[in-house]
């Protein structure tokens, strides 16, 4: 891990500098895609989804409505509306009004990465999916999402950068600590489930 001097920590290791953890506003990311912590009905209500709707405009919700419900653990892609990001990938880690499970988080993260790669995207930014309204534990979220990102980068992919954009210093610290633990594991086990 290396501090670039601009408040962003850059991870350097076997997956080089392709996973980055930072504090900030996900909706301001100038990446090919940002990920929405979505419910399976793709209703942009509160939390991250609400912020995306407010900044990205109603077009994103209209596109979600046209897609309709998707299974928990899957993801869907829409335009970025008025956001800097070209696309929003909606990771359905819970049912509307429900909670997030480890399995749903793992699958929706992996599916989001696959959708980005299928579209040939170079950069994607994730929030801490499921830790807000859905009540999933931040530490477990960090472990699952970082492992999925590392696993994805081990295969051939168009993705060059995977950002984890956390809303405060505490969340960022949890993700940084999780990443250090994962990287300290013996070779071949760092991306095991």
Regions found by a protein language model. Give the residues of each.
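Short, Lys/Arg-enriched N-terminal segments with co-localized hydrophobic residues
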Residues: 2-10
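Short, intrinsically disordered low-complexity segments
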Residues: 1-3, 17, 52, 180
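Phosphate/ribose-phosphate-bearing ligand recognition and processing surfaces
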Residues: 96-193
């Amino acid at each position: 891990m290396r501090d670039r001097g601009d408040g962003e920590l850059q991870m350097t290791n076997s997956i080089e500098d392709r996973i980055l953890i930072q504090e900030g506003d996900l909706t301001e990311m100038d990446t090919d895609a940002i990920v929405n912590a979505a419910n399976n009905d793709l209703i942009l209500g509160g939390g991250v989804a609400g912020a995306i709707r407010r900044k990205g405009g109603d077009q994103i919700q209209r596109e979600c409505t046209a897609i309709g419900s998707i299974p928990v653990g899957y993801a869907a892609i829409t335009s970025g509306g008025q956001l800097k990001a070209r696309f929003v990938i909606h990771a359905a880690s819970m049912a509307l009004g429900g909670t997030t499970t480890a399995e749903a988080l793992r699958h929706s993260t992996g599916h989001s990465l696959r959708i980005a790669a299928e579209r040939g995207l170079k950069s994607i930014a994730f929030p801490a999916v499921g830790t807000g309204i859905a009540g999933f534990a931040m530490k477990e979220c960090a472990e699952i999402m970082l492992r999925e990102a590392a696993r994805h980068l081990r295969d051939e992919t168009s993705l060059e950068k995977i950002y984890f954009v956390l809303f405060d210093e505490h969340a960022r610290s949890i993700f940084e600590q999780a990443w250090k633990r994962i990287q300290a594991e013996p070779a071949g086990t760092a991306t095991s489930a």
